[in-house]
Amino acid sequence: MIILVGGEKGGAGKSCLSQNLAVYLQTKNRDVLLLDADPQGTTTDWAKEREENDGLTNLPCVQASGNIRQILKDLATRYQVVVVDAGGQDSEALRSAMTVATHLLLPFRPKRRDLKTLVHVSQLVKLAKAVNPDMLVRGVITQCPTLPSQVQRILDAKEACQSFGIEPLQSITCNRNVYDDADENGSSVLEAETDLKAKEEVESLVAEFLEV
């Protein structure tokens, strides 16, 4: 299984989702590898922090850039799950990964500047589907406001995804400090004791996305 987390706009939480996905699957006894294809190296730094924390399980992480198609095909024969953090830009790494990924998760914040990228992202998905028709593609609305008065913004964002042929998950993530706190020490919200709502969000998201 190759799970690709990517998109065209930075700041939507792709690295955070990649990390939490990987930890979740590891807790389910899957042999997981993280591949950081983002030039910023956020997930690589996270994995190093995690390795230095004796209270956390080690989660292997490698870096790669450019055309990573063959790299992913090789890694998929050695690990049960490869989770790819492709970062927030249209890159050769993102495009090449889309040709072999079994699952593609596209995070969007419920903001106009994020949703404007749907035009181009949907075109990339269409191109990838021509050579990788079995890839499961889902959008997810992230960093959502928790105020009840803002629910319509979330619904509108999901509708925007649908209008471009990208099926959104019912599950969302909300704007919670614990996501940033966990990222800074190599942890995940699944291992944090401070905010169980964030843990429930990730568990719901992964269960819906991967049906596990």
Positions of the model-derived regions?
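P-loop/Walker-type NTP enzyme "switch/lid" segment
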Residues: 2-8, 12, 23-95, 131, ...
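Hydrophobic positions on the alpha1 helix immediately C-terminal to the Walker A/P-loop
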Residues: 17
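Inter-motif core of Ras-like GTPase G domains
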Residues: 93-112
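Conserved C-terminal guanine-recognition region of P-loop GTPase G domains, centered on the G4
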Residues: 118-134
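Charged helix-capping and loop-helix junction motifs
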Residues: 123, 152-158
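Beta-strand-loop-alpha "switch" segments that mediate conformational coupling across diverse proteins
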Residues: 145, 157-187
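Inter-lobe coupling/hinge region of RecA-like P-loop helicase motors
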Residues: 180-199, 203
